[in-house]
């Protein structure tokens, strides 16, 4: 699958859901928004070999 994280493009081999992908990447779910094939996605969505996943960091604070 194609992965974009922090603006960097990668090709990654992964079978499973978004939650397991984030664990594999050591990314905290609370700090990101994930798009799967251009649409916002839940952590239970299943990722396939031909999918495009974009991990966008959320900026928060006061």
Residue ranges and their predicted role:
Residues 1-61:
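Ubiquitin-like/PB1-type beta-grasp interaction modules and other compact soluble beta-rich domains
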